[in-house]
Curated annotation (Swiss-Prot):
Stated role: Methylates eRF1 on 'Gln-182' using S-adenosyl L-methionine as methyl donor. eRF1 needs to be complexed to eRF3 in its GTP-bound form to be efficiently methylated.
Gene Ontology CC entries for this record: cytosol; eRF1 methyltransferase complex; nucleus
Enzyme class: transferase
InterPro entries, per database record: DNA_methylase_N6_adenine_CS, Euk-Arch_PrmC-MTase, SAM-dependent_MTases_sf
Gene behind this protein: mtq2
UniProt-listed GO biological process terms: cellular response to heat; cytoplasmic translational termination; methylation
Molecular function (Gene Ontology), one example: nucleic acid binding
Keyword field contains ATP-binding: no
Membership in a protein family: Belongs to the eukaryotic/archaeal PrmC-related family.
Subunit structure: Heterodimer of mtq2-trm112. mtq2 is the catalytic subunit carrying the catalytic and the S-adenosyl L-methionine binding sites.
Catalytic reactions of this protein: L-glutaminyl-[peptide chain release factor] + S-adenosyl-L-methionine = N(5)-methyl-L-glutaminyl-[peptide chain release factor] + S-adenosyl-L-homocysteine + H(+)
Protein name: eRF1 methyltransferase catalytic subunit mtq2
Chain sites annotated for binding substrate: N130, P131, P132, Y133
Compartments, record wording: Cytoplasm; Nucleus
Amino acid sequence: MLSTPVTSQLRLKEFQDVYEPAEDTFALLDALEKDAKKLRQMAEMKNLLTAEIGCGSGCASSFLKSGILKNKPIVHFMSDISNSACRASKITALNNRELYKDDNGLFITVQTSFLDGIRLGNGVDILIFNPPYVPTEFEEIPSEAATIASAWAGGTDGMDVTSTLLNQLKDILSQDGVFYMVAVARNKLHSICEILQKDGFIVNETLKRKAGRETLSILRIYRIGNTIWDE
């Protein structure tokens, strides 16, 4: 079992608006570790381009890049609308490269919405996303990037932010790529499946876990015909 990345810098006041690793984060880490063998198999086949959207603390990014895919020649992008989150993620990446003894590959942090402005085309091989999934009134979705609410307020059915990415996924993920996303039961998982199936994707619920009043699901999503992930 891999160690959880260290994110001790989040105790500093300058990072008070950065979402700290919580049950949803740990569920995502467990899902990634569950698939570690296949993820490493992907890295043996080619130099991967990987990314996390809404990187927050950078915990999941460091776990994937420096933990599971340690010493692989990977370029990993971390994006967030929050400047504080981008800075926190960069520190997490640097600190945990030493922890995991990861001496290869590259972390790139970009302050942006989704992957806007980063010309990756259909080039992302592994994509991870722990979206703001809590159902809220639309007015509760913050317009300011530096608010902690931007990490959890998901609007109607908790799907406002997620739906935007799902509609872009076919233009982001590589042919043999895989996408891991956190969701909760209130997000209407059947609707997520319907949206993605129309675009030629297969959706697997790879992990399910209770967290307080929520039921967390980690979805593994890939294109039809992806021979690595077809089960």
